[in-house]
């Protein structure tokens, strides 16, 4: 079976991950002690994607929980789902990374990383046919970003041919937790470009917007935000875990979504998002789901898909529905909004259908898009990065842990290259020879304007 080993790193990663395990356990009918209490054999048929069956038919999540301080892991241990996890899979140090990427990547994290890789190796050895890893972390702090990227590169060395999918919480434009977020994020993106296969970009501000605008929550908590993310996480792998008419897995996703190896940063969305109060007044239909997943207000990262073009996209529908209708709707989206899709990749939407809907719903849809507008997110981080780096603000915290300024410069230029690659493909067209010169000229003009504005 196609198992996935789940690794959650740092405070954010562990909180999102804990919520994810609640959602998946509910879908498979597993209670907090790890025993099966479900009502249909379909829940057990491919349960071993995320769970390992141990003696006494107890199901244990294939999860590795990592942090540089004990706090969050202790609270997961004490929570209602704490007893599900294998106690050996909790790995933590005492000192914390203090929002410092260098501590997570080079000093504190480097001491812990070997023991984490051992745990990951044990989990991988329990698998018949390991498909890949999913990593949950944030890029703004120290542990998730520093230790998270270190772990990704270590796992990559050991399992070079397995998929590496990350759920990365990006720093938001308006909501900032720490001053040094731009540094941590830029250094992390530098690593993710090289070592990850698929990066799902999430950011808190977009999640807050969904909670305020769509779900009508007046005071959204992190629990609410994490619940949104976990819905997408479970949706992406639904096809692996339940029988479906059109299946997809992490590798099929990558093959269909990534036209060029560096461009693997995705926007994700989920439907139906409705306020609890309005739940009873909504009929769910395939056209409505399709319309909602392509809506910019549904994206979980603060980039507007209307500012860019889709290179590729993928949608996973769950529930009893006709595949013909799904295909028609997807085709309709493409023909109606053809200017938002690049014309040099015909039929660039992949759709898959899974027969089992999420708990308590008739149908749902998960969306993953590779849109050039994601460059907005990198540009924003890049501007904040260069503003601080020009003055060498806060650098001593990083150089003190043995980093070199050169690494910052490299990370910055790698991210700038990424932005210009996205821009290049946004402007590219089918008959490109003539166009390319124009695009370069335009691109040059655009950059100058931006500099003046700034």
Swiss-Prot record:
Superkingdom classification of source: Eukaryota
Protein's UniProt keywords contain Nucleus: yes
GO-annotated molecular function: GTP binding; GTPase activity; metal ion binding; structural constituent of cytoskeleton
GO CC terms: cytoplasm; microtubule; nucleus; spindle
Cofactor section: Mg(2+)
Presence of keyword Cytoplasm: yes
Major place of residence: cytoplasm
GO process annotations (BP): microtubule-based process
PROSITE patterns the UniProt entry points to: TUBULIN, TUBULIN_B_AUTOREG
Biased composition (Acidic residues): 429-441
Pfam families: Tubulin, Tubulin_C
Binding annotation for Mg(2+): 69
Chain positions covered by the region annotation Disordered: 426-454
This protein's UniProt keywords: Cytoplasm, Cytoskeleton, GTP-binding, Magnesium, Metal-binding, Microtubule, Nucleotide-binding, Nucleus
Annotated residues for binding of GTP: 11, 69, 138, 142-144, 204, 226
InterPro entries: Beta-tubulin_BS (IPR013838), Beta_tubulin (IPR002453), Tub_FtsZ_C (IPR008280), Tubulin (IPR000217), Tubulin/FtsZ-like_C (IPR037103), Tubulin/FtsZ_2-layer-sand-dom (IPR018316), Tubulin/FtsZ_GTPase_sf (IPR036525), Tubulin_C (IPR023123)
Subcellular location: Cytoplasm, Cytoskeleton, Spindle; Nucleus
Function: Tubulin is the major constituent of microtubules, a cylinder consisting of laterally associated linear protofilaments composed of alpha- and beta-tubulin heterodimers. Microtubules grow by the addition of GTP-tubulin dimers to the microtubule end, where a stabilizing cap forms. Below the cap, tubulin dimers are in GDP-bound state, owing to GTPase activity of alpha-tubulin.
Subunit-level organization: Dimer of alpha and beta chains. A typical microtubule is a hollow water-filled tube with an outer diameter of 25 nm and an inner diameter of 15 nM. Alpha-beta heterodimers associate head-to-tail to form protofilaments running lengthwise along the microtubule wall with the beta-tubulin subunit facing the microtubule plus end conferring a structural polarity. Microtubules usually have 13 protofilaments but different protofilament numbers can be found in some organisms and specialized cells.
Family: Belongs to the tubulin family.
Name of the protein in its database record: Tubulin beta-2 chain
């Amino acid at each position: 079976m196609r198992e996935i080993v789940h690794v959650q790193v740092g405070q954010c990663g562990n909180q999102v991950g804990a919520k994810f395990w609640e959602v998946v356990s509910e879908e498979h009918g597993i209670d907090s002690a790890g025993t099966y209490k479900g009502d249909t054999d379909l829940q057990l048929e491919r349960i071993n994607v995320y769970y390992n069956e141990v003696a006494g038919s107890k199901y244990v999540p294939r999860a590795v929980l990592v942090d540089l301080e004990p706090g969050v892991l202790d609270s997961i241990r004490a929570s209602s789902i704490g007893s599900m996890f294998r106690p050996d899979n909790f790995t933590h140090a005492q000192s914390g990374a203090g929002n410092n990427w260098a501590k997570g990547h080079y000093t504190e994290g480097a001491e812990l990383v070997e023991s984490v890789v051992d745990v990951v190796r044990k989990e991988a050895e329990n698998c018949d046919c390991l498909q890949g890893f999913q990593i949950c972390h944030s890029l703004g702090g120290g542990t998730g970003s520093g230790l998270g990227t270190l772990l990704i590169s270590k796992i990559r060395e050991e399992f070079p041919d397995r998929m590496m999918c990350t759920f990365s919480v990006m720093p938001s434009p308006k909501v900032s937790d720490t001053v040094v977020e731009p540094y941590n994020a830029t250094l992390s993106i530098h690593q993710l470009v090289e070592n990850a296969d698929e990066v799902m970009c999430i950011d808190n501000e977009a999640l807050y917007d969904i909670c305020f605008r769509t779900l009508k929550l007046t005071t959204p908590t992190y629990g609410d935000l994490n619940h949104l993310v976990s819905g997408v996480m479970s949706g992406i792998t639904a096809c692996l875990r339940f029988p479906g008419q059109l299946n997809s897995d992490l590798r099929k996703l990558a093959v269909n979504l990534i036209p060029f190896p560096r461009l693997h940063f995705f926007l994700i969305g989920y439907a139906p998002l409705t306020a609890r109060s309005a739940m009873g007044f909504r009929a769910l239909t395939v056209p409505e789901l399709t319309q909602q997943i392509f809506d910019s207000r549904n994206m979980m990262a603060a980039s507007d898909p209307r500012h860019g073009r889709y290179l590729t996209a993928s949608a996973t529908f769950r529930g009893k529905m006709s595949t013909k209708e799904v295909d028609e709707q997807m085709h309709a989206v493409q023909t109606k909004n053809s200017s938002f899709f690049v014309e040099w990749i015909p039929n660039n939407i992949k759709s898959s259908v899974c027969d089992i809907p999420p708990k308590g719903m008739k149908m749902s849809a998960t969306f993953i898009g590779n849109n050039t507008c994601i460059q907005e997110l990198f540009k924003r981080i890049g501007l904040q990065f260069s503003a601080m780096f020009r003055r060498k603000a806060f650098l001593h915290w990083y150089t003190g842990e043995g980093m070199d300024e050169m690494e910052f410069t490299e990370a910055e230029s790698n991210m700038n290259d990424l932005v210009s690659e996205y821009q290049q493909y946004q402007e590219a067209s089918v008959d490109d020879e003539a166009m390319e010169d124009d695009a370069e000229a335009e691109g040059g003009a655009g950059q100058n304007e931006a500099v003046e504005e700034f």
